[in-house]
Amino acid sequence: SSLLRCYYQDLQSLRRRLTFAGISELLTAIALKIRHDSYLSSSQLITDLQQVSKKLSNQYHGLFVNLVQDLIKKINLFHFYFAKIDIRQNSSIHRQVVADILRSTSLCPDYLKLAEDEKIKLLSASIDNQGLSNGNYTALALEVIATLQAVQTIQAKNGLESIERYVISNTDSVASILEVLWLAQIVNNDLANQPALRLEIVPLFETIEDLANADQIMETLYNLPIYQKNLKVWQRQQTIMLGFSDGTKDGGYLMANWAIFQAKKRLSKLAAKYDIA
């Protein structure tokens, strides 16, 4: 990535100045590892640079150690990804994509006609199926799958923190949240010896009706075994977004503010009940 090239250039600059015995060799080895994408995380690079810093302090009276520390600070700040990216998609898109995949693989002829509890049951039962991320699907389904595969690639190359949050706009049901978890998992199921895609799923409740139902939706979700596994991955932390603009269009300024206030109270109480941060 361009950020790693910047780190490589910084190291080259250090190598030209730090020609001390034992230091030059360390910097050369670090530069080669960056050039060949050998570092799996920024913490590994920092560990190697700290060895350089320690050696300078112990053997060369700390000469130029400030330059190495400056680079360490830069890497601590920007890691391998510079800034975090969020992914956002409308729940209606996920619904269409899941319906297409299930229909094309003969798992369900018409997912959209299922009742909510039937959708939950089907998604829970098929979430570990392999071979679902590749198929003769619609362009929309292929685009969503490709997006998730791209996120996995970016996470593998730049660290899990580079892209973590997946925001579901217009969340209106338990299924609309599970559909994203299901899509992410079917991508993971078909990975061959690669790091797993990891998403922090963030429901966004926007309309007055959805804000009113938010706590009921989340309570049902918290009690589902497949979502409990996801909560465990995130140390029982759950981010929830409450939208203002759609609520204003739906019920007006005062109604939207009141609905958000009430939703916050109920969701906070629910989180405490289930020991969720």
Predicted feature descriptions by range:
Residues L191-L199:
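A conserved P-loop NTPase coupling/switch region
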Residues S1-K157:
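Extended, charge-enriched "interface" segments that sit outside catalytic cores
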Residues S1-S2, K269-A277:
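Structured mid-domain segments that build the active-site/substrate or prosthetic-cofactor binding neighborhood
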Residues K74, R266-L270:
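Alpha-helical scaffold elements within enzyme catalytic domains, especially in hydrolases
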Residues A83-I85, N90-L178, W182, I186-D190, ...:
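Active-site cores of enzymes that catalyze phosphoryl transfer or operate on phosphate-rich substrates
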